Amino acid sequence: MKVYKLVLMRHGESIWNELNKFTGWHDVDLSNRGVQESLKAAKLLKKHGFYFDYAYSSVLKRSIHTLWNIIKFLDQSWIPVKKSWRLNERHYGALEGLNKDDVIQKYGNDKVQQWRRSFNIAPPKISYLEKKKLAHDSRYNNINFDILPYCESLKLTTQRVLPYWLNEIFPRFQKNTKIIIVAHGNSLRALIKYLNNINDIDILNLNIATGFPIIYEFNSEFKPIQYYYLKQ
């Protein structure tokens, strides 16, 4: 049976991951550990014979730089790379930039876990002025203001990720294009929820590790068979 493989990967550890802060759409770079994670992932991909025709990332530099490190190591810097805000991390609203332990102390662990892990519940919103500032960012100034988020639940994240998968990435993948997607914990959770038909309760338990390639296998009809981490 013919098997088609897609590579998904969460960016390497970011500076704010290291500092235990909510990051979301804030554009922070990789930590030193994150750089090493991306290089380790590149070595694993090379060891297992993975090479690519096309790559996708978000418009956030922790995703972009992870991808750069991988394709540079694979000597594939020439392949087309498409960046989209639709692959961005979930927008954590007013929590962005705050230390997670401080937020737990203020709101309680149960509430914070609802914000972080549930499918439907969104964290507190940013202000209108903060959203206007976001809308003036050159990465987002061509997007309808009403579409830009004040905050996002995983459900809202899914609603922006899936159209990009269905209309852009999947049609290219169906042409037997070898693709790598470097994105974020929650944008990947959204995609995996769809691909594996995970229900709204079970998705609470899905966590995506930084820096490890996820290999997604599809059959000849491009139906998902299984996915697994490439760790050795």
Curated annotation (Swiss-Prot):
PROSITE patterns linked to this entry: PG_MUTASE
Q: Which UniProt keywords apply?
A: Gluconeogenesis, Glycolysis, Isomerase
GO MF, one example: phosphoglycerate mutase activity
Top EC group? isomerase
Q: Do the record's keywords include Isomerase?
A: yes
Protein's pathway: Carbohydrate degradation; glycolysis; pyruvate from D-glyceraldehyde 3-phosphate: step 3/5
So what does this thing catalyse?
(2R)-2-phosphoglycerate = (2R)-3-phosphoglycerate
Q: Where does the record place the site Transition state stabilizer?
A: H184
Residue sites binding substrate per the record: 10-17, 23-24, 62, 89-92, 100, 116-117, 185-186
HAMAP family, per database record: PGAM_GpmA
| Assigned protein family | Belongs to the phosphoglycerate mutase family. BPG-dependent PGAM subfamily.
Q: What is this protein called?
A: 2,3-bisphosphoglycerate-dependent phosphoglycerate mutase
Native organism: Buchnera aphidicola subsp. Baizongia pistaciae (strain Bp)
